[in-house]
Amino acid sequence: MANRSKSYVIIILIIILLVLGLVFLGTGCTGDENYKGSVPAKKTSSEITGSQEIFLKGSDTVLPLAQAEAEEFTNENPGKSVSVTGGGSGVGITALIDGEVDIATASREMKPEELEAAKVNGINPVEHTIAYDGISVIVNPQNPVSELTFGQLRGIYNGSISNWKEVGGEDRPIVTISRDSSSGTYEFFKEEVLLGDEYRPDALTQPATGGILLEVSQNPNAVGYIGVAYLDESVKALNLDAGNGSVAPSSENITSGAYPLSRALYFYTNGEPSGLTKEFIDFVMSEKGQNLISEVGYFPVQ
């Protein structure tokens, strides 16, 4: 009798274990059905943090403009955030390709290799021209030189001209200051002025426009180049002659195209913008946004 009771207990325990096993097995199967096995698509910062915040990164030339637009936009739209940082056009474009920002700001067009990298990453860059700008060649106010031809400027930056007396100045060595290679201004200057030549190897590079301003303002022998919007009384802007006479970097000459170092400024988005990104770009392109571009020292597109 005792043996029969033990048998019943064992059978009951086996049944319980089987039932529990089926329950756990069913739970596991349900989890497998819910997991599709695909890697989630890379999201932009705004998709991760919510649609009330967007991130811009890139050109130091575009930085003051973008900051002013962001401040005005957020003042008019409480609860919405627009974060703007610099670092250079190349840095911003890389961030867009990597899905880290909503807008890349740039003072040059994207390169073919950047477009290819974007395609590989599933990013579809769309270009938006938001303003125009000019590049000023600057010297220390103590420097008597007031203008340069493009040939002279090319010689200074490729190293074939190394003394200010060679361009009508005093007998002093020329100290050339340049942006680093991540800068769109660096690329534009190389294409338009150096025409394929390399920068002289002893050129001092700066990661930001402010560094060029500081160096030139403190060194009577220095020469540099910056966006017109950054000009202040600590430096002197030179007139440039590209073959049609000496031209100053004035607003009239830049907007008319007479000044030889004029260029467009860009926003790049992943595909056609939507949501808060579209709202912000629409604001920048509105009458109020374009008026603000003029106030900051740039030149509107409309």
Which residue ranges define each predicted feature?
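Exported/periplasmic ABC-transporter solute-binding proteins
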Residues: 2-14, 18-302
